[in-house]
Amino acid sequence: MEFTAKANFVRVSPQKARLVLDLIKGQRVEDALNTLLFTKKGIAPAIYKLVHSAMDNANYLSNEKGLDLDLDRLYVKKAIANDGPRMKRIRPAPMGRAFRYQRRISHIEISLAEKPGFQGSTATTVEDEAPKAKGAKGAKAKKAPAKKAAAKKAPAKKFAGKKTAKR
């Protein structure tokens, strides 16, 4: 099941918002929040609030519907920034003229989903590493293939140049 949160009419261009959204796409929610805390882009705090809101939505809906949801297994499934309406503005120009420009607005949407078969902690334990170490020692180490002798290059011929007849 997907849990979404939307922020409409955010005063940032969609291109700038996508830079930050691409950082968190596919990450666990906890990792995404940590990434957003240390991102120096201006839109990062707004996206942080949005991910947190989506996580709260997931918690609320799972309690309402009686779902067994583990918040540690949530990950960012979809993070998109769409264009909103553009605000037309005028910048004064020399000689009484005016130049028009557009302030871009974006609609940001984040969807969280639960990863099936995903363990909450990514750290490996000592018990998990013990069988791996035994298997590595028991296998014979493969030798690297012998290097071929490098072929010697013939020295390059010198260019004699174009000879012209003297008059």
UniProtKB/Swiss-Prot annotation:
GO CC terms, sorted: cytosolic large ribosomal subunit
Q: Is RNA-binding found in the keyword set?
A: yes
Question: Could you tell me one molecular function GO term of this UniProt entry?
Answer: structural constituent of ribosome
Q: Where is this region: Disordered?
A: 120-167
**What is one Gene Ontology biological process annotated in the Swiss-Prot or TrEMBL record?**
translation
Any one Pfam family here would be Ribosomal_L22
Q: Output the superkingdom of the source species.
A: Bacteria
- Which CDD domains did the record assign? Ribosomal_L22
Alphabetically list the UniProt keywords: Ribonucleoprotein, Ribosomal protein, RNA-binding, rRNA-binding
Q: Where is the composition biased (Basic residues)?
A: 134-167
User: In its keyword annotation, does this UniProt entry include Cell cycle?
Assistant: no
UniProt xrefs under SUPFAM superfamilies: Ribosomal protein L22
Similarity field = Belongs to the universal ribosomal protein uL22 family.
- What quaternary structure, including any partners, is listed in this protein's UniProt entry? Part of the 50S ribosomal subunit.
List, alphabetically, the HAMAP family matched. Answer: Ribosomal_uL22_B (MF_01331_B)
Write out the function statement from the record. Answer: This protein binds specifically to 23S rRNA; its binding is stimulated by other ribosomal proteins, e.g. L4, L17, and L20. It is important during the early stages of 50S assembly. It makes multiple contacts with different domains of the 23S rRNA in the assembled 50S subunit and ribosome. The globular domain of the protein is located near the polypeptide exit tunnel on the outside of the subunit, while an extended beta-hairpin is found that lines the wall of the exit tunnel in the center of the 70S ribosome.
- What's the protein here called? Large ribosomal subunit protein uL22
